[in-house]
């Protein structure tokens, strides 16, 4: 009986020790959990897409930043992100004392704003509303650039549609002047041919009707030493001592600064 009682006492002592050990372990676990909660950093990210509040930071997955094709998921993401950015704007204005103006427009055209008091007239007055509406109604810049580039490429591929070069009035005037000069030259050549035909030998029994200079008188404008001398290219007529008197009334347009003597 004594052995049995000792055994019971020992077993009871062991049970007491086990209870105390369990209590110590529970207290240690609670302390470690409290320390972990104190040392763990506070998550300030409001990105809740694809995650739940019960999941830890390690279980979060990174989403690819691209346009969401599914309409329902796109609307859900818009609602969550809009609420998060509005919250961030409010916290920024309160924590730092800065003025914040946040403008968010949904896919359906609804406008959401967050403004601090000093910037609130920008979205409440008619001028600000009209400016926002004008910006929303403006065409897309990227689309306009693509259309312009496409139109430029079309004009480059179709040379038949290119405008004709503008005529320069100076060039036209110069061409007309050159044509006029050419006509004058032709007239001068015709006059010279007629003069050569009139230079045929005449009979020596009389003087021409246009003769005005007496024989022996020199031609004014010709040096005295050259008067009465034969010049090459001018035929001398029989019965005339002064070759210049015969050609006195014949006007040659090819000779510059010529004068006609009578």
Curated annotation (Swiss-Prot):
All copies of domain MADS-box, residue ranges: 58-118
GO biological process terms, semicolon-separated: cell adhesion; DNA damage response; filamentous growth; filamentous growth of a population of unicellular organisms; positive regulation of pseudohyphal growth by positive regulation of transcription from RNA polymerase II promoter; positive regulation of transcription by RNA polymerase II; regulation of pseudohyphal growth
Polar residues composition bias: residue spans: 150-170
Molecular functions (GO terms): DNA binding; DNA-binding transcription factor activity, RNA polymerase II-specific; protein dimerization activity; RNA polymerase II cis-regulatory region sequence-specific DNA binding
Region (Disordered) residue spans: 1-62, 140-262
One Gene Ontology cellular component annotation held by this UniProt entry: chromatin
Induction of the gene: Expression is high in white-phase cells and low in opaque-phase cells.
Keywords assigned by UniProt, alphabetized: Cell adhesion, DNA-binding, Nucleus, Transcription, Transcription regulation, Virulence
InterPro entries reported for this sequence: MADS-box/MEF2_TF (IPR050142), SRF-like_MADS-box (IPR033897), TF_MADSbox (IPR002100), TF_MADSbox_sf (IPR036879)
Location within or outside the cell: Nucleus
Key word Nucleus present: yes
Chief location: nucleus
Pfam (any one): SRF-TF
SMART domains hit by this protein: MADS
Record flagged with keyword Transcription regulation: yes
Low complexity composition-biased segments: 17-35, 182-198, 224-239, 249-262
Protein purpose: Transcription factor that is recruited by AHR1 to the promoters of genes involved in biofilm formation, which include several key adhesion genes. Plays an important role in cell adhesion, hyphal growth and virulence. Implicated in the regulation of opaque-phase-specific gene expression.
Subunit field text: Interacts with AHR1.
Name used for this protein in its record: Transcription factor of morphogenesis MCM1
The encoding gene: MCM1
